[in-house]
Amino acid sequence: MTGLSGDKFDLLVIGGGITGCGVARDAAMRGLRVALFEGDDFASGTSGRSSRLIHGGIRYLERGQLHLVHESIRERQTLLRIAPHLVKPLAFTWPIYRGARVGKLKLGAGLLVYQLMAVGRSRRHFTLNAAETVAREPCLKSAGLTGGAVYYDACTDDALLTVANALSARDNGATVVSHTRVIELLRENGKATGAIVKPQHAGEAYEVRARAIVNATGVWENGFITDERARRRRGSKGVHISVARERVGNRDALTLISPVDGRVMFCLPAGPQAIIGTTDTWTSDSPETVHASVDDVDYLLRSANAYFPRAQLTRDDVMSAWAGIRPLASASVTNPSAVSREHSIITDSSGVINVTGGKLTTYRSMAEEIVDLVQRSLAQKRQRAATDSTELPGADRAKEIARLQRENESLSTPLVEALPYTGAHLVYGVRVEMAQTLSDLLIRRTHLAFETRDHGLSVAHRAAEIVAPLLGWSGETKSDRVREYERDVERMFGIT
């Protein structure tokens, strides 16, 4: 990539999470010359550690955030349309218990508003009596149950959604580079004019020039921000755990109220697993070191066990636990759940456009707003990109992986028994989805690391053998990459 040295782009995007990749896609589709650099892998931070929900945000109604709910519902329907292979409708059951903070009247009113905002955009919600609720979800505690409601949102593969945006940006002419970190901004007369970037594994640092720069690094502290307003951001830690779904027994998604602190939480179906989350606590941890604590795990187990008395989950049931940091526009409040999930966009004195906050669901509209600002800063007439009607790539993914399996039978063997991932998934991840490391493949192009108790460590050597010829790894490099994966697993999935 050193051939980029000295090149001048219209836009430099720093950060390959969902926001950065969405911005790069939108800008490239408008005809701008775009370069995006991500220091690790696409979605390796917050974007790949979400609840994997594309949702209207029904819980935001309680705080009166009607604009955010309306935008989220609109964007949910947009994503269902442009990425049906990645975004799927999902039914949620919300049980109601006697004396609960959210009772029948409050939930009914909320769902009515939710439905009115989504008119013509989703299936209608409906209510249940106690017997119907238990019939729908027999795993639930029946004592004190007075009824329930069913409403519809959507789920996704957060990492693959991010990668799809990166691929779309590249397909529209953007230069999209992962595992290459921006180490310093270039400035002339106080204005940012480019950056010095350095590949993660090999190669010398080089310069990239740009007329506009978007900092989409979220909570990463990188020294790029010079404006005090843009520094007013805080990190909220969100922890999820996964357990065997048969231990819980949920048929669909469940929306619950934690008896510990009254927060809305979810129990979500994920194939043979159930994902339970999430926490919401202020943290000073860095995104590179954030992890689930014993207290986080115990909170989620205690909250879940209040609803699933037959399960009585313990720490031994936890297959995986992981944490991400939500970048929130800072507020002087004790409870991070009270902070709006709406985004903020601030242009600092050097001309860098900094974005903080936002939701996975609303990334596309947020990117559109950011690129509008970029075009104004470049004195360009606003051009509308058809990001809301152009399908994201990847619809042929399953077909292409099946073709690889037919062409090479050795690639059809499951990497782990009872899981769908094969060597063909790894080959496809490298050839098509820009994967470069074992973590890229086992954590994000597949979810094998989330779905095995050893987080894929037992197949790391085999995975390295499969992709080594594609990535040009020598024997020594293969060993280095396996050790790198072991460190990544400990950092991401360790509980302390």
Predicted regions mapped to residue ranges:
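A conserved short coil-to-beta-strand element within the FAD-binding core of flavoproteins
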Residues: 178-193
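Beta1/beta-strand and adjacent pyrophosphate-binding region of the FAD-binding site
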Residues: 5-19
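Dinucleotide-binding Rossmann-like beta1-alpha1 core, especially the glycine-rich loop
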Residues: 52-136
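Short hydrophobic core segments
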Residues: 14, 208-218
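Flavin (primarily FAD) binding-site architecture
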Residues: 215-228
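C-terminal accessory subdomains/tails of enzymes that are appended
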Residues: 3, 8, 40, 86, ...
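Glycine-rich FAD pyrophosphate-binding loop
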Residues: 28-49
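Core beta-strand elements of the Rossmann-like FAD/NAD(P) dinucleotide-binding domain
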Residues: 7-9, 202-212
